[in-house]
């Protein structure tokens, strides 16, 4: 063997040995179980799979098929586990084509999300999950609570969530959950879509743009604010307060409780039935409100080309259109 061949062979052996050591260390780290009530994922680009059930602790496996970025780092924080992807979410260029998410920097090429790191997490169903400053695609089983901030684009699906849900979407991210046992706070800045099952607590929805929210039944009071063309749809709902600036739409199957609506623009509200007490509407523009139930103690102010129709009215009525007194019952003048 020549001196050059020997050097090459020795170097190859050394590199192979280092790779074996590195792989062994990685496997050891990923095999560790953490005693954590909360998992926080931040500064992350990639995929997340969370398997929840009867697990006593939290374990994390990291695979990085594309090697585009460094592996995320794990750190214990009291009763929690922090996972830092080490990636800035600013200046991301993200799009979805044929169901495939592609992400890259504005000054560089895009890559399929499958080329970024994958986090596979096993945890108890009581897990409190936090996802912040992240662009990701993922799924989760049942959770204790969810605090989610999604940037640019992505999608996430979960099972039932026992307690509160806090969601902020900046861009075109999508979230789907099953039933929620606590309060829900949703903020969408862009075109994100949120689909929820039943909500046992109160609900607050804020949309700035063209985002859509669909919810089954809501037990508590709900507040909706739309600035733009966003749409919100409910099943059966308790008290409802709505503010629309633009062309947004709100629909519900039934509403039983206090009802208040303010429309500035061409927004529309349609509720098929229920009992609203009191019933208060103010329209400045061409928006319409249609209530197919019974409204009690009605106050209506219409300015512009807007229209309010109510199936039945009980109690007091204070109804004015462009400064003139109006009374309509059952959709007729």
Where are these regions (language model features)?
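Structural beta-strand/beta-sheet cores of well-ordered domains, especially the beta-sheet scaffolds
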Residues: 37, 248, 279, 296-298
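Periodic glycine anchor positions in long extracellular repeat architectures
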Residues: 154, 171-173, 190-192, 209-211, ...
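Acidic (Asp/Glu) and glycine-rich low-complexity loops/linkers
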Residues: 23-170, 174-188, 193-206, 214-216, ...
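Hydrophilic extracytoplasmic domains
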Residues: 266, 273, 284-333
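Gram-negative bacterial Sec-dependent N-terminal signal peptides
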Residues: 1-24
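Eukaryotic tandem repeat interaction scaffolds
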Residues: 211-213, 219-271, 278
């Amino acid at each position: 063997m020549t001196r050059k061949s020997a050097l090459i062979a020795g170097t190859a052996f050394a590199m192979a040995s280092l790779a074996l050591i590195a792989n062994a260390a990685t496997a050891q780290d990923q095999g560790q179980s953490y005693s954590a009530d909360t998992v926080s994922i931040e500064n992350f680009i990639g995929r997340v799979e969370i398997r929840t059930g009867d697990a006593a602790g939290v374990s994390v496996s990291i695979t990085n098929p594309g090697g585009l970025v460094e592996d995320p780092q794990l750190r214990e924080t009291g009763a929690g586990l922090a996972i830092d992807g080490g990636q800035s979410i600013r200046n991301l260029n993200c799009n979805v084509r044929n169901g495939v998410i592609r992400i890259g920097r504005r000054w560089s090429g895009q890559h399929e999300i499958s080329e970024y790191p994958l986090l596979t997490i096993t945890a108890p169903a009581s897990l409190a999950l936090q996802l912040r400053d992240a662009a990701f695609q993922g799924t989760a089983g049942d959770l204790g609570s969810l605090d989610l901030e999604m940037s640019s684009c992505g999608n996430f699906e979960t099972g039932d969530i026992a307690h509160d849900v806090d969601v902020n979407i900046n861009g075109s991210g999508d979230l789907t959950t099953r039933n929620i046992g606590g309060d829900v706070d949703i903020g969408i800045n862009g075109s994100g879509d949120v689909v929820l099952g039943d909500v046992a607590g109160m609900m607050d929805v804020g949309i700035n743009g063209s985002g859509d929210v669909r919810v089954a039944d809501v037990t508590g009071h709900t507040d909706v604010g739309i600035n733009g063309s966003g749409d919100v749809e409910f099943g059966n709902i308790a008290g409802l307060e709505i503010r629309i600036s633009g062309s947004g739409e709100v629909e519900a199957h039934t509403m039983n409780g206090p009802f208040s609506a303010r429309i500035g623009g061409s927004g529309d509200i349609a509720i098929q039935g229920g009992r609203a007490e009191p019933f208060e509407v103010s329209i400045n523009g061409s928006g319409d409100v249609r209530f197919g139930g019974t409204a009690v103690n009605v106050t209506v102010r219409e300015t512009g080309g807007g229209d309010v129709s109510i199936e039945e009215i009980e109690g007091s009525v204070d109804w004015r259109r462009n400064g003139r007194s109006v009374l309509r019952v059952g959709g007729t003048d």
